[in-house]
């Protein structure tokens, strides 16, 4: 994917298409992502419905369904006014390789939910005892002056002088979201943010409850014991290389 960030370092403006002579794989990934989006999360479509479960008594289920229908409408009003459709397409492109990662953050009053497709070179994934992805590390290059905007609840006492004196200097920030298994019956995640260059921890938090992890990771297919998925592009890599060389 020449339009997606690579795993190796590149110079700004460096050409990435000089050795691509056949566009089949490049176009195929775009079509793959578009078809997935059209089939699973169609743009401006209502692709889920909340319904009363089997635990709800049948006599009150219609009333519950009516209320859940209103909630479903509100959910899709938020989704359709957000950047979800754009970001999920990018994540589906990564899924063609094998693994997609999306970050869901709380937004503002005018844009309540913000979605962000995270390129794979920016994250490191690990699995827990149940072989599910429950540990996500993310690396970011951020201006010092933007730290307080991105992490408003952070503690910047140790690096306050550096932020004031050199706000345009970029630093490496590591975010860690790790499942806490002290109580296996509760879904709890420990969240830590540190500035690597200054060895300073600026934020520690805890996410509690089912679905509290802001990172959504999904894999196309995987081999036993592996963390990352294997997508259609990964499996077809030999054919892609051969086709590119024979053009």
Kindly give the residue locations of the regions a language model identified.
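Extended, helix-rich architectural segments
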Residues: 1-170
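General secondary-structure edge motif
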Residues: 55, 173-174, 223
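Generic recognition of flexible, low-complexity loop/linker segments
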Residues: 88-92, 158-164, 174-182, 191, ...
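Short, flexible beta-strand-to-coil junctions
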Residues: 95-96, 104-110, 176-185, 194-199
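Secreted/luminal cysteine- and crosslink-motif detector
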Residues: 136, 172, 193-195
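A broad structural signal for short, well-ordered beta-strand segments within beta-sheet-rich domains
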Residues: 171-173, 215
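Extended, charged amphipathic alpha-helical segments
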Residues: 185-247
